[in-house]
A protein has these predicted regions:
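A short, charge-rich alpha-helical start-of-domain segment used by transcription regulators
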Residues: 1-18, 28-31, 48
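Amphipathic alpha-helical segment used for protein-protein interaction
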Residues: 11, 86-117, 167-168, 176, ...
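Short, small-hydrophobic-rich alpha-helical interface motif
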Residues: 16, 30-41, 54-57, 104, ...
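Sigma70-family region 2
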Residues: 26-27, 35-51, 68-71, 157-159
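Arg/Lys-rich amphipathic alpha helix in sigma70-family domain 2
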Residues: 55, 59-77
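Internal acidic/polar
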Residues: 72-94
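Short amphipathic alpha helix immediately N-terminal
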Residues: 112-128
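Solvent-exposed, charged amphipathic helical/linker segments at domain boundaries
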Residues: 132-135, 141-223
Length: 327
């Protein structure tokens, strides 16, 4: 691999990871796709359009993995949720449309066929034209349009985004209410038809079915808040998949990520990722200092002092790089 060739790949790396993560909903799998794309790039001769070539290779690798993942996820214990990633300025903002990164959107993408998901991600996440998508997927332009249309019908129209400052304020109120086991405060924050999902993957204790309705979710949250294990837990707010989320630490280790979704200023969905395998990527990001700053704007938080403040924003950290991987 020449220095120029490696430089071309490194320039494409963040985009390839972003594409693969949106396609798969799994950060570790996305890293594997980037590594495999690099190995193929290493063996390829001169490429006329490196970005298009790498995008096509990564997309095809994702399509292959999605086919096997569907069967694996059908056998998954309890609800399957994507792997959370800590986000902030950096690679996540090189994509014109950030909405496709949202945790709730990644959940909805599970309804799609692999080809529909590819068409949706390429169009919504990377602003590819239908003609370009057709070329990348090896289908006609009419077929590409149809794939995208079906995907959009399944996913629905983009919801009106809750303004970031207001969203963060509600998440912080939710954190305070949870910490104090404040029943009236929690009740005011929950929508009538709120749903709570928990993904333990059979590796930790978690509800295996969604909990629906304000009364049931309220009991569920109060049970969590009063659980002896959480009495000594540490909580913080950090940007996950582009939006504020609640992070829970036990004995200094990340043990849960709670991702809220809002409708009309109230919590309508609460998605709890508890499976330690799915928390590994976010935990590694946090250990590299990607947890943002104190709420008063002072020095960045480190793993040893998460409990002392709320993380209000994040910075993208790639760490030491190896060819074909996101550090």
């Amino acid at each position: 691999v020449t220095a120029g060739s490696l430089e071309q790949f490194e320039a494409a790396r963040p985009r390839l990871f972003s594409l693969a993560y949106r396609m798969l909903g799994e950060a570790a799998e996305a890293e594997d796709v980037v590594q495999e794309a690099y190995l193929r790039w290493e063996k390829a001769g001169p490429v006329a359009t490196p970005a298009a070539w790498l995008t096509r290779v990564a997309t095809n690798l994702c399509l292959t993995r999605l086919t096997s993942a569907r069967a694996r996820r059908e056998r998954y214990t309890g609800p399957w949720l994507p792997e959370p990633v800590v986000t902030g300025p950096g690679p996540w903002e090189t994509v014109e449309q950030r909405d496709s990164l949202r945790f709730g959107v990644l959940v909805l993408l599970e309804r799609l066929t692999p080809a529909e998901r590819a068409a949706f991600v390429l169009r919504e996440g990377f602003d590819y034209s239908h003609r370009e998508i057709a070329s990348l997927l090896g289908v006609s332009e009419a077929n590409a349009r149809q794939l995208y249309r079906r995907a959009r019908e399944h996913v629905g129209e983009p919801r009106k985004r809750f303004e970031a400052p207001a969203q963060k304020e509600v998440v912080e109120r939710f954190l305070t209410a949870m910490h104090q086991a404040d029943l009236p405060a929690l009740e005011r924050l929950l929508a009538e038809d709120v749903v709570a999902w928990s993904d333990g993957g059979g590796k930790v204790s978690a509800a295996r079915r969604p909990i629906t309705g304000r009364a049931k979710v309220l009991r569920f949250l109060l049970g969590l808040a009063r659980h002896p294990r959480l009495a000594s837990a540490e909580f913080t707010v950090a940007p996950v998949n582009g939006e504020p989320a609640l992070l829970v630490f036990e004995s200094g280790a990340l043990s849960a990520v709670m991702v809220p979704e809002f409708t009309g200023g109230r919590l309508s969905e609460i998605r709890n990722v508890l499976n330690p395998d799915k928390l590994a990527f976010a935990a590694a990001q946090l250990s590299n200092g990607q947890a943002g700053t104190r709420h008063d704007g002072s020095r960045p938080l480190k793993p040893s002092n998460f409990s002392s403040a709320l993380a209000s924003s994040g910075t993208s950290t790639t760490g030491p790089k190896r060819p074909g991987s996101r550090g």
